[in-house]
Amino acid sequence: MAWKDEIQHVVVLMLENQSFDRLLGFVRLDDASQRIDGVTGNETTPAALEDPARVVRLERGTAPALYITDPTPGHQFEDIAVQVFGQPRVPDPPTPTMNGFVDNYARQAGPDGKPIGSERAAAGLACLDPALVPVITMLAKSFVVCDRWFSSCPGPTWPNRFFVHAATSNGYIDSPTDMQALAGFLTTRFRMRTIYENLAAAGRTWAVYFGDHAQAFGIGTLHRYARDNFRRLDAFAAEVAAGTLPHYSFLEPGYMDAPGSPAADQHPPHHLLDGERLIAWVYDTLRGNEAVWRKSLLVLLYDEHGGFFDHVPPPATVPPDPASATAEKFKFDRLGVRVPALLISPWVRKGRVDHRVYDHTSLLATVKGLFGLPDFLTRRDAQANALDDANFLAAPRALVDTPANLTALVPSHAPAPRAKKLSDLQQSLMVLSAALGAIGGGGAPGAGAAGNRAEPQSP
């Protein structure tokens, strides 16, 4: 296929904690034959699992208040088990019911310390009207939507981001506590072979670009690449403009609020439009150099669903390795909840829906084939579907056939209220930052980010 000969740059932007149905469930494409498996606004779910006859409707969300979700829906393993299976563990046999989202969220504590209840939970889990998220909607209509892309495990950020780099989390399914984050960073627990070693072995270039913290640097095998391969997000723009973009680029958003630079990861309670602006910035930057754009594939992904409703049951899969197959809580034999995923390039078809099953390791399988890498990393990426050739064209689309200046689509908005405390993810990243500072003398990526709540960050 021509695209495999022509694509020289794969760029991955992975944001945080949104389900497919929440961001893309109501999107309708111009070609009626291309139907996204989304929602209608008539979906109902039990208000409480102990009383399944009492249901609530998950309606189309049109209120700007939905840009900020507070409290954050549960998205640890036990929460996801309730959401998917209706109980805080995976049953035997594992039959997903997808009926525990409202029940689980209703138990989260509000500002008064009391559970928010099913009515508020149902309202907070509404799937969004496409007009609320104009950037991702425009990209979905203009490029390829993957409506069977699942997170790699039913867990939170850390294990799923490990999967996108290493095709395994070494049996790790939770958000790390402070001591676990530190211990994992300092010991062999987080030392997995990654796609980056394989890229280097094949003579391919790569970089991780980050806003304030490089969560990827929690993987011990990447520490030796700190000086040459980890860069701030503004370096991405400079390298695109100069035509020096590496073969593989992984972009991490800013996870923390700072004056003049709000968190752009879309992790609740951060403002969704700040993430929309980052998506637009990455796209506009890449498209701004036509020579680079014509040789690029941008993959927009989310690490996990963040506790938000999705109606498609996650399928079974294979454990990546023995450490995962024998893990105590979960055997890593089922994917996590579906997440938004878009393929963006002049080489992809306009307004197409890809219904193949993918997870984050599909990205690794695709990169292996595209760049001639030596080996698969684990059993998981070895059996994962690579991107379907049917998504791609025999020749690239003209620049005028792709949308321009997506940044202009993002409405102005007041900043999100500052959270009273750090999320589990932010806390673990702060611990990682402290460890980096102690070990790397401030020279490691993210080592200087401990003060990121007081100083502006890139981009």
Task: Report residues per predicted region.
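N-terminal pro-sequences and low-complexity stem/linker regions of secreted or lumenal proteins
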Residues: 1-459
